[in-house]
Regions:
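Binding-site signature for planar aromatic cofactors or substrates
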Residues: 11-20, 94, 102, 107, ...
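A solvent-exposed, acidic/Ser-Thr-rich amphipathic alpha-helical stretch
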Residues: 32-109
Length: 165
């Protein structure tokens, strides 16, 4: 590999890693415009293994918007990222990539004692619902940079703790 190819590969991997981080932040912040902007127009998302839906990125963003209202405090931790960039003939990076990444998602279910938006949540923000599993992301290079073509959630476990008074 030449230095130019190695540099391009590193830059692609960083951009793809940033795309995955952007996914977590958009969901945690409830920023559905940013969520939609992560995808190509025909992007697809599958949350069925976690009891959700499968559909277009727009349809899933609408579903997540409704579902995440139950969890005023949430934080996706996406780790163990394995990024694979397809190669062209000659070893140059191609225009498609896949990422397998584990996630841990502690959340706090909404309740009568939750702080109002913008206020300090204090002790009521302790996570009482946690789920974990693996994301499989597919991405392709677009005019505006790397964008997601597909996200599949493979939930492995979940835990619901009793609410504390």
């Amino acid at each position: 590999m030449t230095q130019r190819v190695e540099h391009t590969t590193v830059m692609d991997r960083l951009a793809i890693d940033d795309l995955v981080t952007g996914y977590a932040i958009a969901v945690d912040d409830g920023d559905w415009a940013a969520y939609r902007a992560l995808f190509v127009p025909d992007g697809h998302v599958d949350y069925r293994s976690a009891g959700g839906i499968a559909g277009s990125a727009d349809a899933v963003a609408d579903w997540l918007d409704e579902m995440m209202r139950r969890f005023p405090v949430r934080q996706h931790l996406i780790v163990n990222r394995r990024i694979g960039v397809a190669l062209r003939d000659g070893g140059a990076p191609g225009d498609t990539a896949t990422v397998q990444a584990d996630y841990l998602n502690p959340m706090h279910l909404a309740g009568p004692h939750d702080a109002p938006p913008g206020a300090s949540a204090g002790a009521s923000a302790a996570p009482n619902y946690t789920c974990a599993g693996r994301y499989v992301f597919a991405a392709r290079r677009a005019a505006e940079g790397w964008r997601l073509t597909e996200v599949v959630v493979h939930e492995k476990w979940r835990q619901l703790l009793p609410a504390h008074a």
